[in-house]
């Protein structure tokens, strides 16, 4: 969605989770969504057709919340991403992962990925971006890799942070918390005067959705949020106790518009939200990428209203 907001037209999307595919189709029926394992997807028919190849490589192999097996983890899809880069030969590549990917224990692996992109003909930019610097009311640090093909003038720069524009959790969610007339909403807004910890959507192995392990839950509790579960609805008028977030509240903290529809099952919806790359961050990075593509085209054609083609 963030890349769409930046001016890209999606040529194709590949997604493994069936419920996630259905959500994408429900919101954007015109998108070509392929619900399949990327390991069996053939990118060669799209060679030369793609301006931007973008993807979020699964984070568990690099997350500090896991065993950090990196390339030894069967869920590591960096090799598949590099295969698609070679097959499709996009003008620009964008890869997103968790902060753990930048850990010292992955220095050699990270260097090998950059070297592979260099060999495939790309200049590489790597930076850690915090979602809270781009209007998203949660910390959510993410490692971003940008590869610009060497036949394109590389004027890419990462977007400048503007944390002063980011709301607190209380201000961001006040209307949703007060939707059912909760009398404690104003007092709660004053308590929730910080930026949220990184949102998670719960583990497939450990039951329903929640807001993460004990440390994260404690941080939520300081803002008047019970992180042990997710509510179906906002607090009632006479509710007493510690409020819980709803899936819609989680989505807003992640930067989704309020009209974006998720899976019907709460657990699935929360996992989809928690696994997402915040659209406002993707938009800002996408705008910087589009500037490079537009500049590369300026000598050959007008760039006005040219839809850039993204593949993800």
Please describe what each predicted stretch is.
Residues 10-12:
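Short beta-strand element of Class I
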Residues 14-17, 96-97:
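Conserved acidic E/D residue at the C-terminus of a beta-strand in Rossmann-like folds
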Residues 18-22:
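Short alpha-helix immediately C-terminal to the canonical SAM-binding loop
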Residues 25, 38-40:
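Class I S-adenosyl-L-methionine-dependent methyltransferase catalytic core
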Residues 41-52, 57-221, 299:
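Class I S-adenosyl-L-methionine
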Residues 30-37:
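Conserved SAM-binding strand-loop segment of SAM-dependent methyltransferases
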Residues 177-312:
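C-terminal target-recognition/interaction regions appended to catalytic cores
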Residues 1-6:
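Conserved SAM-binding loop of SAM-dependent methyltransferases across substrates and taxa
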């Amino acid at each position: 969605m963030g890349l769409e907001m930046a001016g890209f037209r999606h040529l194709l999307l590949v997604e493994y989770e069936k419920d996630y595919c259905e959500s994408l189709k429900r919101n954007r029926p015109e998108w070509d969504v392929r619900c399949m394992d990327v390991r069996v997807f053939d990118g060669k028919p799209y060679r030369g057709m793609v301006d931007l190849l973008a993807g979020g490589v699964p984070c568990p192999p690099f997350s500090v919340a896991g065993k950090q097996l990196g390339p030894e983890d069967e869920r590591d899809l960096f090799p598949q991403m590099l295969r698609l880069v070679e097959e499709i030969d996009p003008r620009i590549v964008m890869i997103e992962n968790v902060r753990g990917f930048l850990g010292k224990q992955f220095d050699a692996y990270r260097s090998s990925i950059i070297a592979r992109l260099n060999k495939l003909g790309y200049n590489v930019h790597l930076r850690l971006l915090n979602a809270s610097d781009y209007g998203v009311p949660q910390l959510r640090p993410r490692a971003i890799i940008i590869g610009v093909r060497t036949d394109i003038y590389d004027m890419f720069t990462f977007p400048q942070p503007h944390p002063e524009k980011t709301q607190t959790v209380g201000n961001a969610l006040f209307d949703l918390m007060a939707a059912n007339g909760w009398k404690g909403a104003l007092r709660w807004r004053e308590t929730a005067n910080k930026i949220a910890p990184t949102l998670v959507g719960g583990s497939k192995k450990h039951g329903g959705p929640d807001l993460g392990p004990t440390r994260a839950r404690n941080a939520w509790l300081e803002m008047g949020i019970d992180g042990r579960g997710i509510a179906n609805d906002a607090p009632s008028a006479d509710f007493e106790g510690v409020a819980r977030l709803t899936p819609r509240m989680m989505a807003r903290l992640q930067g989704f518009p309020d009209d974006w529809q998720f899976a019907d099952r709460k657990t699935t919806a929360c996992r989809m939200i928690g696994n997402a790359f915040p659209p406002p961050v993707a938009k800002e990075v996408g705008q910087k990428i589009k500037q490079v593509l537009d500049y590369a085209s300026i000598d050959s054609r007008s760039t006005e209203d040219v839809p850039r083609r993204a593949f993800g």
